[in-house]
Amino acid sequence: MIDLKLVQRQPEVLAKALADRHSGISVDAFLELDGRRRSLLTEVEGLKSKRNEASAQVAALKRSGQDAAPLLTELSSLSDRIKELDVETTQVKTDVENLLMSMPNIPDSTVPVGADENENVEVGRWGEPRQLDFEPRPHDDIGTALGGLDFERAARLTGSRFVVSLGWAARLERALVNFFLDRHTRHNDYLEVSPPYMVNRASMTGTAQLPKFEEDLFKLAEWDYFLIPTAEVPLTNLHAGEVLEESDLPRAYCAATPCFRSEAGSAGKDTRGIIRLHQFTKVEMVRFAHPEDSFNQLELMRGHACNLLELLELPHRVITLCTGDMGFAAAKTYDVEVWLPAQKTYREISSCSNCTDFQARRADIRFRPKGGKTAFVHTLNGSGLPTGRTIAAILENGQQKDGSVVLPKVLVPYMDGVESIEPR
């Protein structure tokens, strides 16, 4: 959430940010509404002061035996007017809060200004795609032919955009989760967490999935609970309403969880394979940082995601998202994209974002500087990594002419010595 004081004191800064993000929100309209809120509060306070004076006068008249009827009539009118204004004030305050909650985060000055993904900027690349002497097959064809991915049974069990993983595929998913968590906890100093897969409305609001993106979420019909779209939600909200010590920053958490997404608005996109599913497994990284250190932490987190792909021998590139393509809560985002030979392009496999104090302000997560007032922490999140898209990349990049798939060497110990998946 944007700082209201920033809106009031530097409206031109917010106006430019909203324009760069193509949000369509009018700062002038917001300031007019907020002005009405402040005017109402002033008017109500003035009327309450008059009511207090009138009450004192009524008491004095009654003590002296004089007629207080005219003042009682005035007192009644004042009370009625205050009640009317209280109702209007409550509504205007709600409108101000709702409009404030609908504003995206302010982009960092290093973020390129652009309208959409076509204006993102590549900032790094690792590895060279293999030169194949045969036409590469898509991962879903490979996985199905090798007996590991079953889309037909998943469709009968549930519906479209689901998959059943069997045998080596289920084992590979488990191996990836263990490999990712081992790297994060043993080498990158993350604390592993096993959080609930359902969260309440307050938690979803804290990380800014609500109220804007409710249609993208799965909600339990009889409860005000939501299935998590990412472990970012429970991990970030671990410290909701808390004050951390400055000496405890940065804090880093990771978790492997299923993620549930309705994929509203994705009709026709990635209808085949395991790139875009309603349910998938992902290891998430979340960091709480000092405001002066958060962009250093973003570079660190990006490095953690890229290192996993390097160890898996998967060619990839890093891009900085432009203002028009960033997520709602992000001040700066790096997307890491892995090479998929069958699509002859790079596809997103990790997104690492610095949300500055945007989520912390909504979830009320603060820290206590030495000798100073409490301040909001900066929150960061990143994929480290999703198993589905990683399996897709392994299948496509490791495919051989005979139909087999060579596994990355780093996974062999996690697969009990299995080095390749052979045709049945």
Swiss-Prot record:
The answer to whether the entry has keyword rRNA-binding is no
Residues where ATP binds: 261-263, 348-351
Q: What is its EC number?
A: 6.1.1.11
Query: Binding positions for L-serine?
Result: 230-232, 284, 383
Disulfide-bonded cysteines:
none
What top-level class of enzyme does the UniProt entry assign? Answer: ligase
Coarsely, its chief localization is cytoplasm
Q: In which pathway does it act?
A: Aminoacyl-tRNA biosynthesis; selenocysteinyl-tRNA(Sec) biosynthesis; L-seryl-tRNA(Sec) from L-serine and tRNA(Sec): step 1/1
* InterPro entries in UniProt: aa-tRNA-synt_IIb, aa-tRNA-synth_II, aa-tRNA-synth_II/BPL/LPL, Ser-tRNA-ligase_type_1, Ser-tRNA-synth_1_N, SerRS_1_N_sf, SerRS_core, tRNA-bd_arm
Q: Reply yes or no: does the keyword NAD apply.
A: no
**Pfam families noted in UniProt:** Seryl_tRNA_N (PF02403), tRNA-synt_2b (PF00587)
Question: Where in the cell does this protein reside?
Answer: Cytoplasm
- UniProt-listed GO biological process terms: selenocysteine biosynthetic process; seryl-tRNA aminoacylation
What catalytic reaction does the record list?
tRNA(Ser) + L-serine + ATP = L-seryl-tRNA(Ser) + AMP + diphosphate + H(+); tRNA(Sec) + L-serine + ATP = L-seryl-tRNA(Sec) + AMP + diphosphate + H(+)
SUPFAM superfamilies with a match to the protein in the record:
Class II aaRS and biotin synthetases, tRNA-binding arm
Protein family according to the UniProt entry: Belongs to the class-II aminoacyl-tRNA synthetase family. Type-1 seryl-tRNA synthetase subfamily.
Q: What is known of its domains?
A: Consists of two distinct domains, a catalytic core and a N-terminal extension that is involved in tRNA binding.
Q: What subunit structure does UniProt give?
A: Homodimer. The tRNA molecule binds across the dimer.
Which function does this protein serve?
Catalyzes the attachment of serine to tRNA(Ser). Is also able to aminoacylate tRNA(Sec) with serine, to form the misacylated tRNA L-seryl-tRNA(Sec), which will be further converted into selenocysteinyl-tRNA(Sec).
**What NCBIfam families does this protein map onto?**
serS
Protein name as annotated: Serine--tRNA ligase
The organism encoding this protein is Desulfovibrio desulfuricans (strain ATCC 27774 / DSM 6949 / MB)
Query: What is this organism's lineage?
Result: Bacteria, Pseudomonadati, Thermodesulfobacteriota, Desulfovibrionia, Desulfovibrionales
